[in-house]
């Protein structure tokens, strides 16, 4: 049987879709400057998936569809590095960095030496190889000589291109890391599932990269920064600074905070600045990497068997403090997981007073040998979450008490145990435990979800304790009489305000409700994807695993979690109660024609919108958004610190307006078409 002939137009469309999707991946994940909406991106991806299903012989390793994961690997092959991946020597003080500078200048016989200062990302070192611009290998550092081939997992990292912007054969190196928000989300999820949390973002990134299930890797949203070109002389590069610009041109994500320093004092100033500012970042850094800028100087300086002599890691001080464990309390999570929490003698740590630290689970307590009364070292995992890293047995007096697992739930007195023998966490097994319900209600009424400000933590506790709320849907059935029963402090005005907020919450956008349901692995971004795709909660509840897993941004692991959540009869009962209470279960489509027929571009930073939000706002009002200014552009919106688009707009005589002028322009156009501008902005804020 002869091979079937694939129509030429299909081959051309597949190639065009791949190029277009990779371009939009680059805009979104590398430049953080998207030019299309999520809905438009999903449409492109769905079309490519459809064509590759029809013509599987067209699937290639560098297709964007290969990023979503789904393979289960048997193991990782060992690969030899083309050039050893050396580690760095460390220094922790300014005197040692000055000594490093003196050694460098003495060897080179130079009065001053230029350095490149780069933030030291707390992640996993990675080597990436490309042939004719196509990704062929991703390998971990390993022992520096050999590493593991983790190519399939690397493909799931959206900021790492599968095709370069130039068809070069090159090997580069960098860091794969886990953003702080993702680290926190993952650890919260692991604790809810009874799994041990990761100690820090580096461990989380390393553990994720070594997963055999690529779908799980894709679900964890790793990111990257690339900073090194192997054999830079092959590309005419003479300095590290030139190499960073070259990496940007190829389409890699390069850390925007790297700095070219004229001398070592500028390096020290840079280190001091980022030691103060590091908490502004959405990734964890533990110091500054200092590199001699010129490659000819690097070759003269050479390296030892372990580390280069032309670079050093200038580490930030460890954020650790010593304190004492006064007591241990136990929290009950939304899924019943019992989390022991150490009550500490207050101690100053990384700019805040720390009084409590999670002990994660009783296995963690046993391994660390932590007791009530112990002196312990506390640090902030990933710079955010206080945790005990070790006890100090040498300081024990004999009065310390062992911390024993409870034999019943501290809240309801119900039976405790494990759902699975592999679990490390204990759970309350009582399905009616009020602590579970309280946590679920806090998620539902939070600002990110239905935003019912009047239902604070204390009031939720009182409602559950009084038996007035038995599941999350019950808050929509509360009456003035119910609230009045809660006793003093709840007056008529407060009751009216709470009921008004609950009534308004019924009209919130669908993605806010989905966020509030607390579906495992479904955060705000995934909730928006689901709402835009299905348009109703009932459609999501009825969706099959096969349908869900193929939606861009969902994937197999999240799909499995969604299906399991809606398979529960109690969930179906809650949806029915929400519907009867008048809670909006459909997505309100905000699509107006106020700016129909107009083309806009944006430059600079806006006050009221992120770049992604302004693109969505234009789309919702019927406008077309472009990334570059041309004679076909009607208006350029100019924010703070505008770029080259502003000069081009002036040259082409394209009309420009400030953000304030733009909003006034929308107001006038809305009124002309019979729309209420304030209502539009209110609806937009609710939706976004």
Curated annotation (Swiss-Prot):
Residues 590-679 form the BRCT domain. Zn(2+) binds at residues 409, 412, 428, 433. GO terms for cellular component: cytosol. The keyword Transmembrane does not apply. It comes from the Bacteria. Its EC number is 6.5.1.2. One of its GO terms (biological process) is DNA repair. Pfam families: BRCT, DNA_ligase_aden, DNA_ligase_OB, DNA_ligase_ZBD, HHH_2, HHH_5, Nlig-Ia. It catalyses: NAD(+) + (deoxyribonucleotide)n-3'-hydroxyl + 5'-phospho-(deoxyribonucleotide)m = (deoxyribonucleotide)n+m + AMP + beta-nicotinamide D-nucleotide. The keyword GTP-binding does not apply. CDD domains: BRCT_DNA_ligase_like, LIGANc. Belongs to the NAD-dependent DNA ligase family. LigA subfamily. DNA ligase that catalyzes the formation of phosphodiester linkages between 5'-phosphoryl and 3'-hydroxyl groups in double-stranded DNA using NAD as a coenzyme and as the energy source for the reaction. It is essential for DNA replication and repair of damaged DNA. This is DNA ligase. The gene is ligA.
């Amino acid at each position: 049987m002869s091979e079937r002939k694939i129509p030429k137009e299909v081959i051309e469309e597949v190639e065009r879709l791949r190029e277009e999707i990779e371009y939009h991946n680059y805009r979104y994940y590398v430049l953080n400057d998207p030019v299309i909406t999520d809905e438009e991106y999903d449409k492109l991806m769905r079309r490519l998936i459809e064509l590759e299903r029809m013509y599987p012989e067209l699937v290639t390793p560098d297709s964007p569809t290969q990023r979503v994961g789904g393979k289960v690997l048997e193991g990782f092959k060992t690969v030899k590095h083309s050039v050893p991946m050396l580690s760095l020597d460390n220094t922790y003080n300014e005197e040692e960095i000055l000594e490093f500078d003196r050694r460098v200048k003495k060897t080179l016989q130079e009065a001053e030496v230029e350095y490149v200062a780069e933030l030291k990302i707390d992640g996993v070192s990675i080597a990436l190889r490309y042939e004719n611009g196509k990704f062929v290998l991703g390998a971990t550092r390993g022992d520096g000589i050999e590493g593991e081939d983790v190519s399939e997992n690397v493909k799931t990292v959206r900021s790492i291109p599968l095709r370069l912007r130039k068809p070069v054969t090159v090997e580069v190196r960098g860091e794969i890391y886990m953003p702080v928000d993702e680290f926190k989300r993952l650890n919260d999820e692991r604790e809810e599932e009874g799994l041990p949390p990761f100690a820090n973002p580096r461990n989380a990134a390393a553990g994720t990269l070594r997963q055999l299930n690529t779908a799980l890797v894709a679900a964890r949203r790793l990111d990257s920064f690339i900073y090194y070109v192997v054999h830079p002389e092959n590309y005419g590069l003479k300095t590290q600074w030139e190499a960073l610009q070259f990496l940007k041109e190829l389409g890699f994500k390069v850390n925007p905070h790297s700095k070219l320093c004229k001398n070592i004092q500028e390096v020290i100033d840079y280190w001091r600045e980022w030691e103060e500012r590091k908490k502004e970042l959405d990734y964890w850094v533990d110091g500054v990497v200092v590199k001699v800028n010129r490659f000819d100087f690097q070759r003269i300086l050479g390296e030892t068997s372990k580390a280069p002599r032309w670079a050093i890691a200038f580490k930030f001080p460890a954020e650790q403090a010593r304190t004492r464990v006064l007591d241990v309390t136990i929290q009950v999570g939304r899924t019943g997981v019992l989390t022991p929490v150490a009550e500490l003698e207050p101690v100053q740590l990384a700019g805040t007073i720390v009084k409590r630290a999670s002990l994660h689970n009783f296995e963690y307590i046993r391994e660390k040998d932590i007791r009530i009364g112990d002196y312990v070292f506390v640090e902030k995992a990933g710079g955010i979450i206080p945790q005990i890293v070790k006890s100090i047995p040498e300081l024990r007096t004999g009065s310390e008490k062992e911390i024993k697992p409870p034999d019943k739930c501290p809240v309801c007195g119900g039976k405790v145990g494990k759902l699975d023998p592999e679990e490390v966490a204990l759970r309350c097994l009582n399905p009616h435990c009020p602590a579970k319900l309280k946590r679920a209600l806090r998620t539902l009424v939070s600002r990110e979800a239905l935003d019912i400000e009047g239902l604070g933590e204390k009031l939720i506790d009182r409602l559950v304790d009084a038996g007035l709320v038995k599941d999350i849907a019950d808050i929509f059935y509360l009456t003035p009489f119910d609230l009045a029963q809660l006793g003093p402090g709840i007056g008529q005005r407060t009751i009216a305000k709470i009921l008004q907020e609950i009534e308004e919450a019924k009209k919130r956008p669908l993605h806010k409700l989905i966020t509030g349901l607390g579906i495992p692995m479904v955060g705000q971004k995934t909730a928006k994807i689901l709402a835009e795709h299905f348009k109703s909660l009932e459609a999501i509840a009825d969706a099959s695993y096969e349908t869900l897993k193929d939606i861009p941004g969902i994937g197999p692991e999240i799909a499995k979690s969604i299906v399991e959540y809606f398979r529960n009869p109690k969930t179906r009962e809650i949806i029915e109660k929400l519907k009867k209470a008048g809670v909006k279960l459909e997505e309100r489509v905000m699509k107006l024609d106020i700016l129909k027929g107009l083309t806009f571009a944006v430059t600079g930073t806006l006050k009221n919108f992120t770049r992604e939000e302004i693109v969505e706002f234009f789309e919702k009002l019927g406008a077309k958004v472009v990334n570059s200014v041309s004679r076909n552009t009607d208006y350029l919106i100019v924010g703070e610190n505008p770029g080259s688009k502003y000069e081009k707009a002036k040259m082409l005589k394209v009309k420009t307006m400030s953000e304030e002028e733009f909003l006034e322009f929308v107001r006038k156009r809305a009124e002309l078409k019979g729309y209420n501008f304030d209502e539009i902005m209110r609806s937009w804020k609710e939706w976004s």
